[in-house]
């Protein structure tokens, strides 16, 4: 306000842009693929959280992988993909269609043309971004020279000719450090030497499931001679199907901005429950240096269940860890209550009754027992409730069992 009471507006420019060019998800899990409606909702969600990439690669779609990758989609399924592409465009999301030919590919002209024909069909459905996956295969399809030859052929005969198509993305067979040959002039080095420089190469980190570190990215970038396109296997749970991974998206190096070309999260087969982890991935890829995983987890819970955010946080906090698994990947769970439980059990083991901890745990178990009813009563997201309902049932039982156990211990 000026001295004469007038309001003066000063011009300014607000500049906001992402650290990572490609940000989104890869539907790349094993198990039942998402439904058409699930994908529509996901694409709308991505638009809201500034994600711009959705890679279609469900392992159990036979027209994406074997046995039918050479064949066109049936008319009804093709129509759905066309509608998904249109929805993606409305939300400023690139729909990337991936093919997975490596299980039974023949390294000949016929199969090279078969890939181009399939891409041409998908191009006709509106797709302008493409990927080729060679992950989780063995035998003939794993040869790096042959893979590079096919990818360069696609680049020269399809990507370059089409003037409106984005750079080709590939997922290698050796897609993490623990599975990679460390010797020079082997698989990754061959890809780095032979692949056209514009082709993007995906990478899951030091392991199949694990954290993303700058050190690990530098290791692979040197070998593939380009910045890796990160495929982060979180919150995917196909290796622990009886668990939900709904905790914070952490374990992501905030100094890796200049070491990655893209960042996509591989979600669970439960799309609504996956939104918690996806939200964190989106915030990380937009601004690495300012990323705070716990802050963004709280924001995600508030956005995903605004009708009952506190109850939802309680549920997510206690459904975060995959438990014992073959990947040896663990997550923090029950963060605030864990030390109380440990102190309680320690005191009991020493024949002392921990009155203070008992009172805290009594409140906690009461809260756990009541949380499912609160979520069911207040949430308007029926799809989410349907996805997590088995865990809501067990969560209530956990709270009731905990309360009974405390009473038994105090009586003893």
How does the language model describe each region?
Residues 1-2, 276-287, 398-406:
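Short, Φ-rich (hydrophobic/aromatic) sequence segments
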Residues 1-111, 118, 124-128:
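Feature activates predominantly on carbohydrate-active enzymes
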Residues 28-29, 67, 118, 124-128, ...:
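Catalytic-core regions of glycoside hydrolase
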Residues 74, 108, 144, 206, ...:
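Hydrophobic alpha-helical scaffolding
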Residues 42, 80, 118, 146, ...:
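General structural feature for long, well-ordered alpha-helical segments within catalytic domains
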Residues 23-24, 157, 399:
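Glycine-centered structural positions embedded in regular secondary structure
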Residues 291-412:
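C-terminal functional modules
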């Amino acid at each position: 306000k000026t001295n004469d009471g007038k309001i003066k507006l000063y011009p300014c420019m607000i500049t906001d842009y992402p650290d990572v060019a490609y940000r989104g998800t890869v539907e790349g899990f094993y198990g039942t693929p998402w439904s058409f409606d699930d994908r529509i909702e996901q694409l709308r969600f991505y638009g809201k959280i500034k994600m711009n990439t959705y890679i279609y690669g469900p392992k159990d779609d036979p027209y994406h992988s074997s046995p039918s990758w050479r064949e066109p989609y049936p008319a009804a399924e093709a129509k759905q993909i066309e509608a998904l592409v249109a929805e993606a465009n409305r939300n400023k999301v690139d729909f990337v269609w991936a093919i997975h030919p490596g299980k039974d590919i023949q390294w000949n002209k016929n199969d090279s043309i078969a890939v181009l024909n399939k891409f041409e069909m998908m191009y006709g459905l509106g797709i302008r971004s493409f990927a080729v996956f060679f992950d989780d295969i063995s035998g003939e399809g794993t040869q790096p020279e042959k893979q590079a030859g096919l990818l360069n052929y696609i680049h020269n005969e399809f990507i370059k000719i089409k003037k409106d198509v984005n750079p080709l993305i590939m997922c290698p067979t050796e897609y993490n450090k623990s599975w990679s040959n460390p010797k020079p002039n082997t698989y990754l080095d061959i890809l780095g030497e032979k692949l056209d420089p514009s082709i993007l190469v995906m990478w899951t980190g030091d392991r199949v499931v694990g954290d993303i570190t700058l050190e690990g990215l530098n290791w692979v970038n040197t070998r593939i001679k380009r910045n890796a396109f990160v495929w982060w296997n979180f919150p995917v749970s196909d290796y622990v199907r009886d668990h939900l991974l709904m905790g914070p998206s952490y374990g992501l190096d905030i100094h890796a901005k200049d070491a990655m070309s893209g960042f996509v999260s591989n979600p669970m087969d439960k799309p609504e429950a996956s939104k918690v982890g996806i939200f964190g991935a989106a915030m990380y890829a937009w601004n690495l240096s300012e990323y705070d995983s716990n802050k963004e987890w709280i924001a995600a819970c508030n956005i995903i269940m605004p009708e009952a955010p506190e109850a939802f946080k309680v549920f997510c906090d206690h459904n975060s860890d995959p438990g014992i698994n073959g990947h040896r990947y663990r997550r923090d769970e029950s963060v605030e209550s864990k030390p109380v439980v440990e102190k309680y059990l320690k005191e009991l083991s020493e024949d002392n009754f921990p009155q203070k901890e008992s009172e805290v745990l009594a409140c906690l178990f009461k809260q756990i027992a009541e949380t499912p009813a609160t979520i069911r009563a207040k949430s308007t997201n029926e799809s989410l409730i349907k996805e997590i309902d088995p865990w809501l049932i067990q969560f209530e039982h956990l709270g009731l069992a905990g309360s009974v156990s405390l009473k038994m211990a105090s009586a003893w």
